[in-house]
């Protein structure tokens, strides 16, 4: 759980302690083109400035398309739109009163589009608490301007949070909200529905779409028949379905028409020997270490997903926390934790540091290899953080870390930004509005106080989220 006091709010939304971010809502991010007067005092507290026109010049531009970074570029913002993007040496005409930023030594990227986020956090004993006050500003301060919740335990709260953000009452990113999980009987989390029949899945999807949900997520124990009915119902109403699956293999899910699969290949049961249909075989993680990633056993699954148009969500941030030799959460993230959670997290970091035979370390590297193989074969990769696990994946901070892990996995800086921005926008069907820095698109941008092309630690120094 995250503290939400006035002091913690500043740590969350302005991050003054460690990463030096200021959340600036010029023509407010996630608040459309509202004026400052239309915003609540809670939002105005985090607005750095308001101008009709903003020019960022002489900046290193990573535009989200995967193209090489452009040095000395300029970007002009009019209202809530990007009106011009110019290469080095080009002067863009501006109006009197334009706010001008000298971007020397800084990087401009599109606002992050993250697809496995939550408004809840683990509290032990299979219980999850909602954090609708602290999480939205944390995400925005971490550069996330659009997010999809990767499952909901309190959907009415999530839907209300989205409405409050859109109305300018609280700071936060645009939200694509999943309904409650599509889970089968026997699920271990008390707040999840347990859908036993196709009819129940259809009713579930239709009810929550009527309430405003725009996506759905299937979970471990659902059967193929029930999931297939849920997918069909969601598609009939223009919604997509993702899954953290176990009882259903990735190939089976692709055949059912699923749009997305979570956690890379962490949850795949395609390679479990003698797997029973519609049954979840637990404790099989080490099977990944024996896979030959060049053999048909693996490549056939990958190719089937690609041919079926299934996106894969990388969530290496939550996997990393189990491994040894990994950095502790940054200072600001630690400060946002309750004292008892912080104590538990740091004790686990210390234990992991002393383990030389930790299988989670080898698994982390294997998951990276599998995701990179999927990407290299033409798979559509998106990214999220999954702020659950042991409680040390903190929104905002983890989103910055997610980009770094994609680069560690083998992507270039430009490719990692593309996966974290454009690909998410494409998946959500919003790439005509967001995801890349192009004239005419919404000005969802993040200015970073450093050059990420030479030092990826600079992703921690997000200065302004537009």
Question: Language-model features: where?
Answer:
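Active-site neighborhoods of metal-dependent hydrolases
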Residues: 204-217, 222, 267-409
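Bacterial N-terminal signal peptides
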Residues: 12-26
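Acidic, glycine-enriched loop/beta-strand segments at the rims
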Residues: 43-48, 61-74, 87-90, 394, ...
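Histidine-rich, glycine-flanked metal-binding segment
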Residues: 38-41, 46-52, 61, 67-109
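Divalent metal-dependent hydrolysis catalytic cores, especially in the metallo-beta-lactamase
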Residues: 135-156, 173-180, 210-222, 231, ...
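N-terminal secretory signal peptides that target proteins for export/translocation
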Residues: 1-7
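Divalent metal-coordination and catalytic microenvironments
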Residues: 59, 75, 80, 105, ...
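Metal-associated gating/positioning segment near the N- to mid-region
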Residues: 106-169, 185-188, 193, 199, ...
């Amino acid at each position: 759980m995250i503290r939400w006091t006035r002091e913690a709010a500043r740590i969350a939304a302005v991050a003054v302690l460690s990463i030096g971010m200021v959340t600036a809502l010029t023509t407010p991010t996630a608040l459309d083109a509202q004026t400052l007067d239309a915003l609540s005092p809670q939002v105005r507290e985090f607005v750095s400035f308001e101008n009709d026109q903003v020019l960022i010049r002489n900046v290193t531009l990573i535009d989200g398309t995967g193209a090489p970074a452009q040095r000395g570029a300029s970007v002009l913002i009019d209202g809530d739109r990007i009106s011009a993007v110019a290469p080095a040496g080009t002067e863009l005409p501006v109006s009197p009163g334009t706010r001008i930023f000298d971007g020397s030594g800084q990087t401009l990227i599109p606002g992050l589009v993250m697809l496995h986020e939550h408004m809840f956090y683990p509290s032990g004993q299979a219980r999850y608490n909602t954090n609708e006050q602290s999480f939205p500003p944390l995400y925005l301060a971490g550069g996330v301007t659009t997010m999809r919740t990767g499952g909901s335990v309190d959907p009415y709260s999530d839907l209300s949070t989205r409405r409050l953000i859109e109305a300018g009452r609280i700071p936060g990113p645009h939200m694509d909200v999943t309904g409650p999980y599509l889970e089968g009987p026997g699920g271990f989390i008390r707040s999840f529905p347990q859908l036993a029949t196709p009819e129940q899945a259809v009713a579930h999807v239709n009810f929550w779409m009527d309430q405003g949900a725009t996506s759905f997520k299937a979970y471990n124990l659902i059967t193929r028949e029930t999931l297939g009915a849920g997918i069909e119902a969601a598609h009939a109403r223009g919604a997509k379905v993702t899954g953290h699956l176990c009882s259903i293999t990735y190939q089976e899910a692709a055949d059912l028409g699923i749009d997305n699969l979570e956690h890379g290949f962490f949850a795949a049961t395609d390679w479990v020997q003698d797997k029973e249909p519609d049954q979840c075989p637990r404790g099989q993680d080490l099977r990944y270490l024996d896979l030959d990633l060049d053999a048909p056993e693996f490549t056939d699954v990958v190719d089937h997903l690609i041919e079926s148009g299934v996106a894969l969500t990388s969530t290496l941030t939550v996997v990393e926390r189990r491994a040894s030799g990994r950095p502790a959460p940054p200072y600001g993230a630690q400060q946002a934790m309750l004292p008892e959670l912080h104590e538990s997290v740091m004790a686990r970091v210390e234990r992991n540091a002393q383990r030389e035979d930790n299988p989670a370390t080898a698994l982390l590297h294997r998951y990276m290899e599998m995701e990179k193989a999927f990407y290299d074969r033409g798979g559509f990769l998106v990214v999220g953080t999954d702020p659950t696990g042991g409680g040390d994946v903190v929104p905002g901070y983890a989103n910055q870390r997610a980009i770094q892990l994609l680069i560690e996995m083998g992507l270039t800086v430009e490719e990692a930004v593309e996966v974290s921005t454009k690909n998410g926008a494409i998946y959500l069907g919003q790439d005509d509005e967001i995801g890349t820095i192009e004239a005419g698109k919404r000005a969802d941008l993040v200015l970073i106080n450093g050059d990420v092309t030479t030092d990826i630690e600079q992703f921690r120094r997000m200065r302004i989220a537009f």
